[in-house]
Design a protein with these regions (language model features):
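Short, exposed beta-strand-loop hairpins at the edges of beta-sheets
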Residues: 123-129
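Classical Sec-dependent N-terminal signal peptides that target proteins to the secretory pathway
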Residues: 1-23
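Short, low-complexity, Pro/Ser/Thr/Gly-rich segments in the mature regions of secreted, periplasmic
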Residues: 132-139
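Beta-strand-connecting loop/turn residues
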Residues: 88, 130-132
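Short helix/turn-capping signatures at newly exposed starts of structured segments
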Residues: 17-123
Length: 139
């Protein structure tokens, strides 16, 4: 139950920060990433069913994943958070930021933030048109 409450606060926090991204991009914290990595598939899916009722949040079922993804919209685009599970544990976390109008400030903020995370996390960052893709794994 405690994990569910933390997870709910995490999602609300991410949603709040992404909505305010038009002025300043506030990105998911290291602590929030660690919470996601400690969440099992069942808990993740149960929480997203509940959060799907929020106006700015939507659960998605991607073709290549049996678990849900979380899509949160903000004024300049959206973010999709997708954990990939192996044996019911998060093996990798995919975060996709899409900006309606992307600029150097947006890309630099995202890249610098994710490159400065914990040394125990390995990141792969790819920029393609208006998307910034971040894949995170435990090293």
């Amino acid at each position: 139950m405690k994990k569910c409450v933390y997870f709910l606060f995490l999602v609300i926090f991410v949603n709040y920060n992404v909505i305010n991204a038009s002025e300043k991009i506030s990105l998911i914290s290291l602590n929030d990433i660690k919470i996601i990595f400690s969440t099992d598939a069942k808990t993740w899916n149960q929480n997203l069913v509940f959060l799907d009722k929020k106006l700015s949040m939507k659960k998605l079922q991607l073709d290549n994943n049996s678990n849900y993804s979380l899509k949160t919209t903000f004024s300049n685009g959206y973010v999709v958070i997708t954990p990939y599970f192996k044996l019911d544990l998060v093996e990798s976390l995919n975060i996709n930021y899409y900006f309606n109008s992307i600029n150097k400030k947006n890309t630099d903020s995202v890249i610098n933030h994710f490159q400065s995370l914990d040394k125990d996390l390995c990141n792969y960052i790819k920029i393609d048109k208006n998307d910034i893709f971040i894949d995170i794994k435990n090293c």
